Amino acid sequence: MKIFATIIIFLAGIYGSLSAQTLHGTVVTSDGEAVRLANVAILNPTDSTYIAGTITHDNGTFSIAADSKNLIKVWCTGFMPYLGKVANANMRIVLSPDTIMLGEVEVKAAKPLSRIEGDAIVTNIRGTILQNIGTAKDVLGYLPGIISVQGGIEVLGKGAPTFYINGRKMRSYTELDMLKSNKIKKVELVTNPGARYDSSVNAVIRISADRDPGEGFAIDNTARLGYRDFVYGGDDLSLNYRTGKLDVFSNLKYGYNKSKGHSTNVQNSWLQSSYRQEIGLESEGKSQIYDAQLGADYTISNTSSTGVYYKLTCQPSDKNNVYTGNIYIDNILNESSLIDQGSNTHLTSHTVDGYYTAIFGKWTFDAAFDLLWKYSDDDILSNELINNTDKLRLNTESNVDSRMFAAEAHASHPWLKGNFSFGAEYIDSRRNDDFFNPEHLLNDNQLVLDERNAGIYAQTAQRLGKVTLQLGLRYEHIESRYHEFGKFIPEQSKTYNKVLPSVTLVLPIGKNMLQLSYSRKYKRPLYSQLSSSIYYVNRYLYQSGNPLLKSEYSHNISANYRFGQFMIMANYGLTDDKIISEISQYGDNSNITLLRKENSTHDLHELQAFVTYMPQFGNYFSVLTAGIMAQFYKIDYCGNIRNMNNPIGMVQWKNIVALPRNLKLEASLTWRTCGEAENIDMGHTWSINAGITKVFNRHWQAKISVNDIFNTARKSYNTIYSDYRDIYLEKYVNTRGVECSVRYMFNTTKSKYKGKGAGNNEKPRL
């Protein structure tokens, strides 16, 4: 706590030295959206020579010494520059976009404009061909540095990002489906997040969307129906009622999915004898999701608001697996088996989120809290027949009960030629993990993991001539306490104290922009990865956590360069104690393989480089991304060192054609070569998708899409190497499907809810 006190005193000293400013102002767009990191210059009225300058901070405000006779010039990429006289009172400066809009007529041929701005790659969506493409998820797949992967979104070379919508942390991917593209103003991609974000965050996507209050009742409903082996579908319903300063909102979602597949698993072990296990799997399962959210937002004044919401999510699922297995010892058949396994899983979560945001003079302040309760139970029943004679019946039950409280607060203030911000975050979480096996073939377990996480940060962004420099420092203190059957286990309990710096530099090169950044990160294991419970996958494969896992640490250097219609992105990372999948023998039984996580004994070096080309020809818009992901890594395998250095190539080509009668045609190609990632050798894959969208009027929209037209992505295969074993997995799942969606809108605007949430990176760990 002495470090906390020292930093707080340091921050107070800085702000005690802030001098008063003569001119205060706010820079906004024509939609009222704050313009961050806009250039502000005070000019001599006689010859327009430069006198002083600064940049706006996150809420668009600025302060600068100026005389009433001076001129003020404000400009930012993507907007028309502003030039006028200095006002004596607070100034409100409105920047007009350089995309031409004629009344209610959409400029459908306008190209999304991507630019480097501060710590982010910013892409305007409003007024472009992407405006009516569908949902936020559809939009993101067309942006530089972002790809669509199996229904999710990833940042190239960074994995799954953390999402913010109007400053509020996104809780699940369903929110991307519920946010429609015509509500999005711009998207910001941060490829190397600074001190403001949790140290485990590798990339951030910030989405700015409409939040005009409007009046009265509004409805936005999208129904989906598709076929992929089986019929699947769902419905998303958003309701709003707005009156005066009050906004009451509700979101309801239902989804149903059913799927099947088969796979082949070959396990090789080289011990005193050579073991080979060949396992076939036929699986079929169904899942549902029920999601309900109710909340309210109240605008206290033009500069402050508060809100709260409650969310309930239920996800039941059932699955049936049939395994056929053969075990060979020194190439002689030793055992055959047939396993019929059924599983039933229920997951329920309750979330309460609240926020408060305000501007006091030159200060911007926001605070948030989160309460999360999460329950899951997983029951598995296996009936096994060994060598056509021996029968075995096995039941397992796993119950996980998690809860979390989190709170955070942030403040920012103009300082020198930029701004200064600082904040604090506190998280208190607990996970109870109980595992039972009535037949006592596996050990029962009762685990409790308590964790306290406190963090503070300070960050400043300054304009140094034409260069923007952002410096940040974050300190985190974490205490983790591990209990098994009510007994405290000190060797599995950990305490961390970490100081994590970050630097971002943005500078022009001619008419182009270059962004360079460095950050130090660390990633804690998931709670499930720290569990010592043994989970029964099948007769030959068990899975468990590892309570001795350490956090992994990494150094990241990123470079982004934009010129013309091209965006070049590169990243280098060095990771210590990388958490990887390891396979080993379970106890004294060489027929059973245990899969769990371990810290690698070798450092992992990773290099990624991508080029995105975004041309437009009339009503045709295309995004072509090509790149390579390479690693320099080695593992211990069969008593030798195996190099895992084969790079992976990737190409994604997305196309949109705007047709007459409000039609849009889409087509995309995704291709990935074989290569190696960590200790896994991955196979190649490719697919082609297509779709057509029709807007009937301002209330109705329909879309038909076909995923993986040639069903080429149905096969996936990879090999895991570890110690004296390897596992080859070949999986077939039908990825070809057709889907139709219909959307109805009435008096729709985005909810005004501005909460960011707290403990956002602790939730997925639970």
Annotate each predicted stretch with a short phrase.
Residues 41-43, 75-79, 90-129, 149-150, ...:
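Short, acidic, small-residue-rich periplasmic hinge/interaction motif at the N-terminus
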Residues 46-61:
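Short, acidic Ser/Thr/Gly-rich low-complexity loop/linker segments typical of extracellular
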Residues 89-94, 104, 136-139, 173-174, ...:
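N-terminal periplasmic accessory domains that precede
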Residues 142, 168-194:
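Short acidic/polar hinge/loop motifs at secondary-structure boundaries
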Residues 208-223, 262, 266, 290-292, ...:
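Surface-exposed extracellular loop regions of Gram-negative outer-membrane beta-barrel proteins
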Residues 291-317, 339-484, 508, 512-513, ...:
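Face-selective signature of the C-terminal outer-membrane beta-barrel domain
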Residues 448-451, 491-494, 522-576, 595-607, ...:
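Outer-membrane beta-barrel signature, preferentially recognizing the C-terminal barrel domain
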